[in-house]
Amino acid sequence: MGNCCGTAGSLAQNDNKPKKGRKKQNPFSIDYGLHHGGGDGGGRPLKLIVLNDPTGREIESKYTLGRELGRGEFGVTYLCTDKETDDVFACKSILKKKLRTAVDIEDVRREVEIMRHMPEHPNVVTLKETYEDEHAVHLVMELCEGGELFDRIVARGHYTERAAAAVTKTIMEVVQVCHKHGVMHRDLKPENFLFGNKKETAPLKAIDFGLSVFFKPGERFNEIVGSPYYMAPEVLKRNYGPEVDIWSAGVILYILLCGVPPFWAETEQGVAQAIIRSVLDFRRDPWPKVSENAKDLIRKMLDPDQKRRLTAQQVLDHPWLQNAKTAPNVSLGETVRARLKQFTVMNKLKKRALRVIAEHLSDEEASGIREGFQIMDTSQRGKINIDELKIGLQKLGHAIPQDDLQILMDAGDIDRDGYLDCDEFIAISVHLRKMGNDEHLKKAFAFFDQNNNGYIEIEELREALSDELGTSEEVVDAIIRDVDTDKDGRISYEEFVTMMKTGTDWRKASRQYSRERFNSISLKLMQDASLQVNGDTR
């Protein structure tokens, strides 16, 4: 969805090559002209009216807004208390200045319309009232205090196939009621489900209908929306219907059982190609421990042929869900829980920043790491391979699964020679040991912020990564898109610190990302052989 206003300069016509000292147009800072440049003929800007029939105009006449509960791309969710009854709710305040396009505005209108249209359901959050003032649209909703789906799974020490079956059954019941009432959700993902309260028996509730649409039987859609890892192949092909919700639920089920998405890559084009190919991998841990019934259901939910894909009712009728209470109750292992907690793949900016921090480590900080490297380097070559890394980490008390070890190796192996040299190992150690204190991070940020204005801008990022292997415009754009959470087209120190401390998490993917980038990527894929569907290792 929408981006921030203003541009950062422009390129001369027919000159597409970035040059030193010359600003390239900032593709992440776009002026859509909805908030200025228009008017009533007298120089006064037109007022933006979003809702057709809000409950009222002044939310504070009835409610007291309290602490912040969450923050998204378009606004903030607050704790909200009814002044008369003291009942508590959640208030989702959507800032009008963030609604940059007609599509953004229509999404908000439709979200309200759909939530009003949906029947009361124990697993769908209830919309109580709506307000609209000059600055924001306020949606007063049922309060869900139990936290996110994945967070609760991680908090439990014991995670099983039976628990995954119970969650999947709930999600599919939500999909079923949506489809029964002519609503296609289009953005099913774990973050859009919250537990109603903190009790163990709390209901799981769908909370976000911002990308949902009404549909009629047989109606086809072509707009690319959703979150990249959960998109069905037919969305990328621009010809889809409600079957996309079954696919997204299948992706969630896959993640619930193994901790990572089935279709993953480091760039958005790679993600799109993986989705189109639809190759499932049931060989790595913990899949050998997962029942055949569960794997059979995943195959049928993630069938690339939408005509063969199961309906919501057929999923609920599948033996694995029919017998959810008797599904295996054996722990799927700490690996899955750890992956759900954070599946981190470092982007090139983070890799470079880790090397800068490594270069600034004191002798005392670095010496212990170097000693560890020398112990691992049994062949005395000055570099270690993945086997030496595994043995060395085991000696140091780190038992890392083979798949995650390969991810770590790939992240650290900057020159792609299949080995880690001492400097690469130090950078990885900084990441593993969370050694990036404030002083280290400030030095690393200053390395990129060449003009000392407090931001890493596109040109500075491009220049800093110019000597990195595989750094294309697409990679630079993807870094900005991932790290620049306020969408002003540059990376602040706070955004940089967040990236360094949490990594690039596949769970966080904005609507902006999918709408603007996947539109062009789908066109590109339509023109090459990427649309051919291959077999899988199921």
Curated annotation (Swiss-Prot):
Region (Disordered): 1-37
Pfam families referenced in this protein's UniProt entry, alphabetically: EF-hand_7 (PF13499), Pkinase (PF00069)
Sorted UniProt keywords: ATP-binding, Calcium, Kinase, Lipoprotein, Membrane, Metal-binding, Myristate, Nucleotide-binding, Nucleus, Phosphoprotein, Repeat, Serine/threonine-protein kinase, Transferase
GO cellular component terms given for this protein: cytoplasm; cytosol; nucleus; plasma membrane; plasmodesma
Positions where lipid (N-myristoyl glycine) attaches: G2
The protein's role, per its UniProt record: May play a role in signal transduction pathways that involve calcium as a second messenger. Involved in maintaining Ca2+ homeostasis in pollen tube tips by regulating CNGC18. Functions as regulator of the calcium-mediated abscisic acid (ABA) signaling pathway. Phosphorylates ABA-responsive transcription factor ABF4 in vitro.
Name listed for the protein in its UniProt record: Calcium-dependent protein kinase 32
EC annotation from Swiss-Prot or TrEMBL: 2.7.11.1
Transmembrane helix found in the keyword field: no
Subunit architecture: Interacts with ABF4. Interacts with CNGC18.
Binding positions (Ca(2+) 2): D413, D415, D417, Y419, E424
Membrane topology, record value: Lipid-anchor
InterPro entries in the cross-refs: CDPK_Ser/Thr_kinases, EF-hand-dom_pair, EF_Hand_1_Ca_BS, EF_hand_dom, Kinase-like_dom_sf, Prot_kinase_dom, Protein_kinase_ATP_BS, Ser/Thr_kinase_AS
Binding site for Ca(2+) 1: D377, S379, K383, E388
Residues the record lists as binding Ca(2+) 3: D449, N451, N453, Y455, E460
Keyword Iron-sulfur: no
Signal sequence region: none
Subcellular location: Nucleus; Membrane
Control of this protein's activity: Activated by calcium. Autophosphorylation may play an important role in the regulation of the kinase activity.
GO molecular function, one term: ATP binding
Binding site for Ca(2+) 4: D484, D486, D488, R490, E495
Coarse class of the protein's main subcellular location: nucleus
Active site: D187
